[in-house]
Structures are given as C-alpha cells and as structure tokens.
From Swiss-Prot:
Lineage: Eukaryota, Metazoa, Chordata, Craniata, Vertebrata
Protein name: AP-1 complex subunit sigma-3
Signal sequence residues: none
Gene from which the chain derives: AP1S3
GO MF terms held by the record: clathrin adaptor activity
Listed PANTHER family: ADAPTOR COMPLEXES SMALL SUBUNIT FAMILY
Amino acid sequence: MIHFILLFSRQGKLRLQKWYITLPDKERKKITREIVQIILSRGHRTSSFVDWKELKLVYKRYASLYFCCAIENQDNELLTLEIVHRYVELLDKYFGNVCELDIIFNFEKAYFILDEFIIGGEIQETSKKIAVKAIEDSDMLQEVSTVSQTMGER
C-alpha cells in the first residue's frame, strides 16, 4: 500500500502531496521536509529506492520534478516505479507533455487525475484510456455547468 505521494521540485518546493494515512499536519510537514532533504541530497546515479524508517521510498525524477511514494517494506519497488510512470503518462496525456507549471497552475486537475488512478493507497484504474475519459467527462460537465450558469445570468 502507498502511504503517501509527494511531488517536489529540484529546489525542494512541494508541488503536490497525497496522504493515504492519517497524521497530524505538524508530523506531515516534518516527514515531507526530511524526505525532500534525503532525496535531493542523493546522487543522480544512485538507486531510486531508499529504506526509510519502517517504509521504503521509491522516487523518480521527471524533468524538474521528483515523484516520490512511500510504500510498505513488503511492497514491490519496481511496481511502484511503474505506478509513478503511469501517473506521469496520465498527466502527459491530459496536459500534453506536463511540466512543473502545469502542476502549479492546475493542481486541482493533477489531484483529480491522481484520485482517478489511486484511491486509498491502492491502484484504482489501470487503463489510461478509462482514467483520461473520466477526467475529460468531468471537464465537460464543468464546462456545461459554467455555460448554463452564464446563460442563466443573462
């Protein structure tokens, strides 16, 4: 099970976080700071897996963003890397070659895509087509709602 997912920049700025365990905010901030520091201090040629406390950290850098998942010790690291890659593929499919600015200015869409893909720390939808279709359907509903509200105001 995935305990949490963090997306952060090379400068250490947190761009997205999703927690699948309950922790107080103070503890989350402490953990986030510690993990960002650990990963950013590692060399580029080192392993993408880090034993951390009773969990394993699995991370991958895409352009200027690090995608990091904390998983249980018995979970498969390579499968987790594939989950990270699938999330990046979904972001790319939606945004068209996603970049850090897409995450910053459209964070709600990035969270929505993540929620379509992973729920409760487990993979919910493995099909990219189905996940992207759900996101596009949501966009269409939002657009229709906005148009009908605008028409109602006239």
